[in-house]
């Protein structure tokens, strides 16, 4: 598959090379399956229709911004913008690409700002982001100095959004999304840092997820875990009966104390809570790039401390831990 040709070259002669035994057939099967969907075919055509641009200015450290001198023509800019809008909704961002500002639903830079002070240095490191959505944070990881940033994300639209951005930032940049689930990827125990952000509460078995993350880390590697939490002691967890904030696939929202117990149960050490933040409408909101319901629609209109179902409104915790 041409979408992964660079990636296959990157993982030769390093611990990830064992993936070459399984990934090519897995990704070929994924492509054949996903392109049976007319929407996915349209997304692929949209990405293929984008020009390959090499920016003369690229900032991945403070934001994701690409520009070129002299600037692209107004007609080319409009054509790119129309193609990017054909990949809506954009839930993660923002991106500034040749004068086009993708104002995504989530201001993912806010999360990155909270996480960054607590990271081990990423300079020259190999990092994995599990459930990476459209790869926004992969680019920020490269900006922080990572040598290789790999994301795992099974949702097709997110993959095509990533490929669109990659085409506009530069194909040689060492970031890649694998459109698979983490349980379908062989453990390599080789990543310096593994991220799981906004995933744990979607998993029916949170302990299995933590073990999957651990099995990708090298010894002494850092785990960064960001997830929904509730107040309570080390025995308290919220299991929504039907929906949480209009999401059907939320299974498990633990207290911070219980999350700490889980991490230690799975063998992680030096577990630290580094941030707890209430999700705000400044960070998650409806925009012209994501026009359907957003956080404000998920909260009780009379009491924003509760979801529409009456549960505690979203609070997100960030914990770090290490594999022995």
UniProtKB/Swiss-Prot annotation:
Enzyme class: transferase
Pfam name, any one: Methyltransf_9
InterPro entries, sorted: CmoB (IPR010017), Mo5U34_MeTrfas-like (IPR027555), SAM-dependent_MTases_sf (IPR029063)
GO molecular function terms listed in the Swiss-Prot or TrEMBL record: transferase activity, transferring alkyl or aryl (other than methyl) groups
Positions with a binding annotation for carboxy-S-adenosyl-L-methionine: 92, 106, 111, 131, 182-183, 197, 201, 316
Reaction(s) this enzyme catalyzes, per UniProt: carboxy-S-adenosyl-L-methionine + 5-hydroxyuridine(34) in tRNA = 5-carboxymethoxyuridine(34) in tRNA + S-adenosyl-L-homocysteine + H(+)
Coiled coil: none
Keyword DNA repair in record: no
Keywords annotated in UniProt: Transferase, tRNA processing
GO BP annotations, alphabetical order: tRNA wobble uridine modification
Gene3D superfamilies associated with the record: Vaccinia Virus protein VP39
Enzyme Commission no: 2.5.1.-
Domain of life: Bacteria
Family membership noted in the UniProt record: Belongs to the class I-like SAM-binding methyltransferase superfamily. CmoB family.
Role: Catalyzes carboxymethyl transfer from carboxy-S-adenosyl-L-methionine (Cx-SAM) to 5-hydroxyuridine (ho5U) to form 5-carboxymethoxyuridine (cmo5U) at position 34 in tRNAs.
HAMAP family the record matches: tRNA_carboxymethyltr_CmoB
Subunit structure: Homotetramer.
Protein name: tRNA U34 carboxymethyltransferase
Native source organism of the sequence: Hamiltonella defensa subsp. Acyrthosiphon pisum (strain 5AT)
Name of the gene encoding the protein in the UniProt record: cmoB
């Amino acid at each position: 598959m041409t979408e992964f040709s660079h990636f296959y070259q990157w993982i030769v002669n390093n611990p990830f090379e064992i993936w070459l035994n399984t990934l090519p057939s897995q990704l070929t099967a994924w492509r054949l399956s996903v392109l049976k969907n007319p929407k996915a075919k349209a997304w692929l055509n949209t990405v293929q229709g984008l020009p390959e641009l090499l920016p003369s200015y690229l900032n991945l450290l403070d934001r994701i911004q690409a520009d070129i001198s002299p600037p692209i023509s107004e007609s080319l800019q409009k054509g790119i913008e129309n193609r990017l809008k054909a990949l809506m909704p954009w839930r993660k961002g923002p991106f500034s690409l040749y004068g086009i500002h993708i104002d995504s639903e989530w201001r993912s830079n806010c999360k990155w700002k909270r996480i960054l002070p607590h990271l081990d240095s990423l300079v020259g490191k190999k990092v994995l982001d599990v459930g990476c959505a459209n790869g926004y944070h992969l680019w920020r990881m490269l900006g922080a100095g990572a040598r290789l940033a790999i994301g795992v994300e099974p949702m097709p639209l997110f993959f095509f959004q990533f490929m669109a951005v990659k085409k506009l930032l530069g194909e040689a940049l060492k970031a890649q999304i694998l459109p698979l689930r983490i349980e379908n990827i062989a453990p390599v125990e080789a990543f310096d840092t593994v991220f799981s952000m906004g995933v744990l509460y979607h998993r029916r078995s949170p302990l299995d997820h933590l073990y999957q993350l651990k099995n990708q880390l090298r010894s002494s590697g850092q785990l960064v875990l960001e997830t929904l939490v509730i107040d309570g002691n080390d025995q308290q967890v919220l299991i929504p009966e039907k929906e949480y904030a209009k999401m059907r696939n939320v299974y498990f929202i633990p207290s911070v104390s219980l999350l700490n117990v889980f991490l230690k149960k799975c063998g992680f050490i030096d577990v630290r809570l580094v941030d707890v933040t209430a999700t705000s409408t400044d960070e998650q909101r409806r925009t012209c790039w994501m026009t359907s319901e957003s956080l404000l629609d998920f909260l009780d209109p009379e009491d924003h401390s509760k979801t529409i179902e009456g549960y505690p409104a979203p609070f997100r915790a960030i914990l770090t831990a290490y594999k022995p």
